[in-house]
């Protein structure tokens, strides 16, 4: 799908469709008022007859409006004008895209980017429109025999901006939006792949392909089980012992900073390509969704794609910690004591608390990069879903400025996170009679004790942990990976690169 920006009057547009907003109760937006005036009150007359109230997502498609050059006008309800916020704006864009795609409008000029969204500028509105459009049209049908496609799908969208001065900002928003949407799609595609295809070797192949595509400043190294053993990554290795598939850690290094020696930002993604729970096996119901336990690694892959496509002036390292947790004769057991790469020992009380065992060794491994900061991303705990539901990503950090940066980026990107505490009281729940710590701390505060566990392996750098167990995928009728938090982390890196889109 092609996107562009322009600045022009609605009555002069010669297009298959013009999209304008209507507020409650039956109030025309400024652009709709212009069209109404040109058409001698045609639109307002329809509204007076009750054709459209203006509630969020309501639509009315008009054909051959008098004195208008475009074939059709799509009126879209935007709710109450003063209440139009980020969430409603994206809902309106989503409904617009679906309506245009379903009604055979192959191209359209959209004036919704001129609506006032409190605290948001043209860059934000255009970028969110691009990302939302791509999200709305996303399908995962690679493995289906019969693929369905609209007879006349939407192929071109032009976003109108109020003044010519804002064209540059709009064009930059499209560039960033397309790159982020591409990263989100890449993460979703990986997440949606079945575990018989997407194993640690598949993740490694994708990481290598990314480096090949951006070979001027990107390289990928893959660390196998023999090298992990030599490095002392016994916690990581233990998790994969029950699987026929080799554990592989893919390390993607991108050097975009003119100062090649600048300390990198490191992203570490949990990549459990299937999590049966191991010996502490999960219930059968919903176990198919445990293919999504690699969405942390998928996020890192998607973000690295965004970084490379935009050629951000940063040094960034992405780690995909690939592994599979299966029961078997070689599987690790409750009661085992593992020596981690850091030298700390862990008593295994539950083999289904495996993600932290993979991550703790990966977090120790990345010390060699002398990182500016490290962020790990993991579908780590069901407790985080209980605490925050499916709307907010859980955030924990040992560094307040980093936590504040990430929360700010999450608000900018519309990919929200919420900070949880790391208090000494929670650390005590991890005490073990037989090792330095246990791998679980009981039911109470489970998301926090998991973060506390990881923090014991991050004392040499600034660190943040994103628990995406509630936000990485949807269940039910619309089951599928969401691609979160690619947008959050991409925004964080754009901000770090000084490309945050502020006018």
Swiss-Prot record:
It comes from the Bacteria. Its EC number is 3.4.11.1, 3.4.11.10. It holds the Pfam family Peptidase_M17_N. Mn(2+) 1 binds at residues 275, 352, 354. GO terms for biological process: proteolysis. GO terms for molecular function: aminopeptidase activity; manganese ion binding; metalloaminopeptidase activity. Binds 2 manganese ions per subunit. InterPro entries: Leucine_aapep/pepB (IPR011356), Macro_dom-like (IPR043472), Peptidase_M17_C (IPR000819), Peptidase_M17_leu_NH2_pept (IPR023042), Peptidase_M17_N (IPR008283). Keywords: Aminopeptidase, Cytoplasm, Hydrolase, Manganese, Metal-binding, Protease. Mn(2+) 2 binds at residues 270, 275, 293, 354. GO terms for cellular component: cytoplasm. The active site is at residues 282, 356. Its cofactor is Mn(2+). It is found in: Cytoplasm. It catalyses: Release of an N-terminal amino acid, Xaa-|-Yaa-, in which Xaa is preferably Leu, but may be other amino acids including Pro although not Arg or Lys, and Yaa may be Pro. Amino acid amides and methyl esters are also readily hydrolyzed, but rates on arylamides are exceedingly low; Release of an N-terminal amino acid, preferentially leucine, but not glutamic or aspartic acids. Belongs to the peptidase M17 family. Presumably involved in the processing and regular turnover of intracellular proteins. Catalyzes the removal of unsubstituted N-terminal amino acids from various peptides. This is Probable cytosol aminopeptidase. It comes from Yersinia pestis. The gene is pepA.
């Amino acid at each position: 799908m092609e996107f562009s920006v322009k600045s022009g009057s609605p009555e002069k547009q010669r297009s298959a469709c013009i999209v304008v907003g209507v507020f409650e109760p039956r109030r025309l937006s400024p652009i709709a008022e212009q069209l109404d005036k040109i058409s001698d009150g045609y639109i307002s007359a329809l509204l007076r007859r009750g054709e459209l109230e203006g509630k969020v997502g309501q639509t009315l498609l008009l054909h051959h409006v008098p004195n208008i050059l475009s074939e059709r006008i799509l009126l879209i309800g935007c709710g109450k004008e003063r209440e139009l916020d980020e969430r409603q704006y994206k809902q309106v864009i989503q409904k617009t895209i679906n309506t245009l795609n379903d009604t055979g409008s192959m191209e359209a000029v959209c004036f919704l980017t001129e609506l006032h969204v409190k605290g948001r500028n043209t860059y934000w509105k255009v970028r969110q429109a691009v990302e939302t459009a791509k999200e709305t049209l996303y399908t995962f049908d690679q493995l289906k025999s019969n693929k369905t496609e609209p007879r006349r799908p939407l192929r071109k969208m032009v976003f109108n901006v109020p003044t010519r001065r804002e064209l540059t900002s709009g064009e930059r928003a499209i560039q960033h939006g397309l790159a982020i949407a591409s990263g989100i799609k890449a993460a979703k595609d990986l997440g949606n792949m079945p575990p018989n295809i997407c194993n640690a070797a598949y993740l490694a192949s994708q990481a290598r392909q990314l480096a090949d595509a951006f070979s001027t400043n990107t390289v990928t190294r893959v660390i196998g089980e023999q090298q992990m053993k030599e490095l002392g990554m016994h916690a990581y290795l233990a998790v994969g012992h029950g699987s026929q598939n080799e554990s592989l850690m893919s390390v993607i290094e991108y050097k975009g900073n003119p100062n090649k020696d600048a300390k990198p930002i490191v992203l570490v993604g949990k990549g459990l390509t299937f999590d049966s729970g191991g010996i502490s096996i999960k219930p059968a119901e919903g176990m198919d969704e445990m293919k999504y336990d690699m969405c942390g690694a998928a996020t890192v892959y998607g973000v690295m794609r965004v970084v490379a496509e935009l050629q951000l002036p940063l040094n960034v390292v992405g780690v995909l910690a690939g592994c599979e947790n299966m029961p078997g004769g070689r599987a690790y057991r409750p009661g085992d004591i593992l020596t981690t790469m850091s030298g700390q020992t862990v008593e295994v009380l539950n083999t289904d608390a495996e993600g932290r065992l993979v991550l703790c060794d990966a977090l120790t491994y990345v010390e060699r990069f002398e990182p500016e900061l490290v962020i790990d991303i993991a579908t780590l705990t069901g407790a985080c879903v209980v605490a925050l539901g499916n709307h907010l990503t859980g955030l924990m950090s040992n560094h307040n400025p980093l936590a504040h940066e990430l929360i700010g980026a999450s608000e900018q990107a519309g990919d929200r996170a919420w900070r949880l505490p790391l208090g000494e009281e929670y650390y005590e729940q991890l005490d073990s009679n037989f090792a330095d710590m246990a791998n679980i701390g009981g039911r109470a505060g489970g998301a926090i004790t998991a973060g506390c566990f990881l923090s014991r392996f991050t004392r040499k750098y600034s660190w943040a942990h994103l628990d995406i167990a509630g936000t990485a995928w949807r269940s039910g009728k619309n089951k599928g990976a969401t691609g979160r938090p690619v947008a959050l982390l991409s925004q964080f890196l754009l901000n770090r690169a000084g490309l945050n889109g502020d006018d």
